[in-house]
């Protein structure tokens, strides 16, 4: 229990320094649940929270369409460009890699802690965006298969 408390506090503090308030709040929420020994609650919310996060991201990304920023004609013209082709390919590859990352994260906490620290350092040192945890874990999963580590 003490180890869990320390780890979550360190993540919260590093996140606060990096100004990643989402991770601060998540760490503190889970710290509270951990201190309350609310393991059944954490088990119950783990899978749905991933889907809630994806839902919020999709809403954010679809708002310009809902506001009428794009129409069929402009989208049709854009979709036959090289940029669109590369974007589709990139989306496919990143989604594939992300799927591999999602499968490795629950079973290997060292990967999560490592990519979290790397993400926080990127935010602190280079104005990075804390958006690549699952993709980074996917890269680790693929590399570990290739190099057997």
UniProtKB/Swiss-Prot annotation:
It is a multi-pass membrane protein. It is found in: Cell membrane. The keyword Membrane applies. It comes from the Bacteria. Disulfide bonds: none annotated. GO terms for cellular component: plasma membrane. Coiled coil: none annotated. The chain crosses the membrane at residues 6-26, 48-68, 86-106, 120-140. PANTHER family: UPF0756 MEMBRANE PROTEIN YEAL. HAMAP family: UPF0756. Belongs to the UPF0756 family. This is UPF0756 membrane protein BBR47_12340. It comes from Brevibacillus brevis (strain 47 / JCM 6285 / NBRC 100599).
């Amino acid at each position: 229990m003490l180890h869990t408390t320390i780890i979550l506090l360190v993540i919260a503090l590093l996140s606060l320094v990096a100004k990643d308030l989402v991770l601060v709040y998540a760490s503190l929420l889970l710290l509270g649940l951990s201190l309350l020994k609310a393991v059944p609650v954490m088990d119950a919310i783990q899978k749905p929270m991933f889907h809630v996060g994806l839902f919020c991201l999709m809403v954010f990304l679809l708002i310009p369409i809902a506001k009428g920023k794009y129409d069929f004609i402009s989208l049709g013209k854009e979709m036959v460009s090289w940029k669109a082709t590369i974007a589709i390919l990139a989306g496919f590859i990143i989604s594939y890699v992300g799927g591999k990352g999602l499968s490795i994260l629950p079973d290997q906490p060292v990967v999560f802690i490592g990519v979290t620290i790397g993400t926080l350092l990127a935010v602190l040192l280079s104005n990075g965006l804390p958006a690549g945890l699952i993709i980074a874990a996917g890269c680790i999963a693929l590399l570990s298969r290739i190099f057997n580590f």
